[in-house]
């Protein structure tokens, strides 16, 4: 199993290109199943999750051709994907594939919308909280689907097709909004999604669907309206830049000091996180090529943050911020409101010498003068990269184990950091 070895203490200087957003690329790939024509997606990140979803879609008969593959890239896909779902041969998504990634459960929406039936295993993925699929099932039932759970599978049928309806989520759900959006695109009549998620990735998927002929308005607001159409056609769409990757590298620069240009980043996608970094004493400069992040000489100031749905501070940057605050001059407080059980990185950060106390949903981080390298183990995608951030500033050597989590969500992380002066290498085997 691969590991990453880091020798801390180097400031970061240079340019890091920001990849396409994983959290947009995955639903966009799934949305391609709504049409029998080809969807071309540009700026798709080369990630393990993208490769896994390609296998899952291939199981249904979807043909995906990767263009721009680099020499030696056997696992990851190219930056441009040509996706053709002309012939869907199977409406069952098996456990052995779906159990590896929760987002793959979303195939239930295009299968129901286009084929009027689906049998999809209950999902897997990062072990963060329970993340029940109840809200997704509720949304599909509102659209007229008949659903039951049989031996670990959700069995869904809509013999007469899906019908437009009002779907009001009791709480904001990104997964539920994605599923409702895709299913309603081909439903008969008008669908209203109330209390919809406002994340930029939702807007990106809606923009792509509109290019394919859907009639969607209000994406990016809590109220989305979809007028169903009978057919969607092919299109070409560029995946928006990854705001979580942007924030992650910004915090890495803040942690080590130095100055890095985040090329292709869009500040409006993570303004809340940039505001928090500014409060912490980091210099953020927006320019034509993205965002420049710098911390030269000044210490890190403590902050108090509560995670929230967009446009609030993203839960997917909570672990990275916690790593940064381990070096702050004073006590910081981070409250997690989106997912339960999302403090699994605390125990591993403590191995560096971090001082963190948990009280329910709130972590109090007392900054320390030094972190020391240690062997650590990644527990999930975002927690794993928080360990990398800590290691970059720690004295001595850190070995990060179980880095397959990193490969799920960060494209060429060690290459990007190494190019900016970090001493970091992947050790295979």
Curated annotation (Swiss-Prot):
GO cellular component terms attached to this protein's record: cytoplasm
Family, similarity comment: Belongs to the EPSP synthase family. MurA subfamily.
Protein name (database record): UDP-N-acetylglucosamine 1-carboxyvinyltransferase
Source species, domain of life: Bacteria
EC number: 2.5.1.7
Record keywords: Cell cycle, Cell division, Cell shape, Cell wall biogenesis/degradation, Cytoplasm, Peptidoglycan synthesis, Pyruvate, Transferase
InterPro entries: Enolpyruvate_Tfrase_dom, Enolpyruvate_Tfrase_sf, MurA_subfamily, RNA3'P_cycl/enolpyr_Trfase_a/b, UDP_GlcNAc_COvinyl_MurA
Residues annotated as binding phosphoenolpyruvate: 22-23
Protein task: Cell wall formation. Adds enolpyruvyl to UDP-N-acetylglucosamine.
Compartments where located: Cytoplasm
Species this chain originates from: Rhodopseudomonas palustris (strain BisB5)
